[in-house]
């Protein structure tokens, strides 16, 4: 990470703190992650702006505030094994991989998955397992998960993901179509409780796979 990038990432973390992010581990991960690595060169100059940016294939890299907020919500109970649905650029996975012992991440667009895998390898993040597949289905043979994060908006809460949560586990995801709400769902035995956190805007969670 260059000195300029490090300074920019540290300044971004300070802005996120001012915006309400309080988890110091999350802020530290943000400050140590070169966001420009996850963007095309043409957009690298915008890497440390607090905004979502396009990454191709109709997808985006999420606004840093949302990355930090969802991570903060996910870390509420110190999960050991985490599933991310929607690898995308790999930026959210890079943040999570610095904070949890084991991360599994699914991406339905093959090209994005390949790029993300290469980026995390360059960052020496080796506690991540990648899967090319349909995020609506989760990753059953790696379950149960202590926490699941979905980085695209589901029209309804995927039943497969609920079934793959460990007891006491949390699912953090945006739900809705035109109007979306960020939610945190907690599993207690066979019951689920939900919290609505805030209004958000994500690309839709689409089923199936795309080469």
Swiss-Prot record:
Signal peptide range: none
BP GO terms, sorted: methylation; protein modification process; protein repair
Reactions performed catalytically: [protein]-L-isoaspartate + S-adenosyl-L-methionine = [protein]-L-isoaspartate alpha-methyl ester + S-adenosyl-L-homocysteine
Active site (UniProt): 62
Annotated InterPro entries: PCMT (IPR000682), SAM-dependent_MTases_sf (IPR029063)
Cysteines joined through disulfide linkages: none
Subcellular localization, as worded in the UniProt entry: Cytoplasm
One GO cellular component, as annotated: cytoplasm
Pfam families, A to Z: PCMT
SUPFAM superfamilies per the UniProt record, alphabetical: S-adenosyl-L-methionine-dependent methyltransferases
Enzyme class: transferase
Keywords linked to the UniProt accession: Cytoplasm, Methyltransferase, S-adenosyl-L-methionine, Transferase
Origin: domain of life: Bacteria
EC code: 2.1.1.77
GO molecular function: protein-L-isoaspartate (D-aspartate) O-methyltransferase activity
Role this protein plays: Catalyzes the methyl esterification of L-isoaspartyl residues in peptides and proteins that result from spontaneous decomposition of normal L-aspartyl and L-asparaginyl residues. It plays a role in the repair and/or degradation of damaged proteins.
HAMAP family cross-referenced by the UniProt entry: PIMT
The family this protein is said to belong to: Belongs to the methyltransferase superfamily. L-isoaspartyl/D-aspartyl protein methyltransferase family.
Protein name: Protein-L-isoaspartate O-methyltransferase
Organism: Shewanella baltica (strain OS155 / ATCC BAA-1091)
């Amino acid at each position: 990470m260059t000195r300029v990038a490090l300074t920019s990432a540290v300044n971004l973390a300070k802005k996120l703190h001012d915006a309400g992010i309080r988890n110091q581990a999350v802020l530290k991960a943000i400050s140590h992650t070169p966001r420009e690595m996850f963007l095309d060169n043409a957009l690298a100059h915008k890497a440390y702006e607090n905004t979502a940016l396009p990454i191709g294939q109709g997808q985006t890299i999420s606004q840093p505030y949302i990355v930090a907020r969802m991570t903060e919500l996910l870390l509420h109970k110190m999960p050991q094994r985490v599933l991310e649905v929607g690898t995308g650029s790999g930026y959210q996975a890079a943040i999570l991989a610095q904070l949890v012992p084991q991360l599994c991440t699914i991406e339905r667009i093959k090209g994005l998955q390949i790029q993300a895998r290469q980026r995390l390898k360059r960052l020496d993040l080796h506690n991540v397992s990648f899967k090319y597949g349909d995020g609506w289905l989760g990753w059953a043979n790696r379950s149960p998960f202590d926490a699941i994060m979905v980085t695209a908006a589901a029209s309804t809460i995927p039943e497969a993901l609920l079934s793959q949560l460990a007891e006491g586990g949390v699912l953090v995801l945006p739900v809705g179509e035109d109007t979306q709400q960020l939610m945190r769902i907690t599993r207690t035995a066979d019951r689920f409780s939900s919290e609505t956190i805030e209004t958000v805007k994500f690309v839709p969670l689409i089923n199936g796979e795309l080469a």
